[in-house]
Design a protein with these regions (language model features):
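Intrinsically disordered, low-complexity non-transmembrane regions of multi-pass membrane transporters
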Residues: 1, 98-100
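Acidic-glycine-rich active-site phosphate/pyrophosphate-binding loop
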Residues: 1-3, 31-32
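Preference for bulky hydrophobic residues occupying beta-strand positions
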Residues: 10-12, 39, 67
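Short strand-loop junctions, especially beta-strand C-caps/beta-turns
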Residues: 13-15, 42, 70
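Intrinsically disordered, low-complexity regions enriched in small/polar residues
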Residues: 35, 39, 54, 86-87, ...
C-alpha cells in the first residue's frame, strides 16, 4: 500500500496566534492518526506531535503555515486540521474573550 502525502496552506485565524491551548489540541488530534504530520512557518518546521516544536513556530495571527501529512491516515488528519484552522478554533477564542 502506498503512503498518502497531503500538503495544504492555512492561515492562523486565532486572535492570539497559535498559542498553547490550540497547540495542545493539535497535538491531541495527531495522536489519533497513523501518519507523520509537520507544520512549517517559513524556514521553521515542527513535528505536530510536539508542543514545544509548535510553540517555536511563533505563528502570529494571519501567519500562513504549510501543513504536511504523510502516511495511511494523512488525508483524514489533514481534513481535521484544516477545519481546525479554518474555524479559527472559536472554542478557545470565546474562553479568552470572557477574561477581557
Amino acid at each position: 500500500m502506498q503512503e498518502s502525502v497531503c500538503r495544504q496552506i492555512v492561515t492562523v485565524k486565532m486572535k492570539q496566534g497559535l498559542h498553547l491551548r490550540p497547540i495542545s489540541e493539535i497535538v491531541r488530534m495527531t495522536r489519533d492518526y497513523a501518519c507523520d504530520f509537520k507544520i512549517s512557518n517559513g524556514d521553521r518546521s515542527a513535528n505536530a506531535r510536539e508542543v514545544y516544536d509548535l510553540l517555536e513556530l511563533q505563528a502570529l495571527p494571519e501567519t500562513e503555515l504549510v501543513l504536511e501529512a504523510v502516511g495511511d491516515d494523512a488525508t483524514k488528519l489533514m481534513e481535521e486540521i484544516v477545519q481546525f484552522f479554518e474555524s479559527g478554533y472559536k472554542k478557545f477564542e470565546e474562553v479568552s474573550d470572557l477574561s477581557d
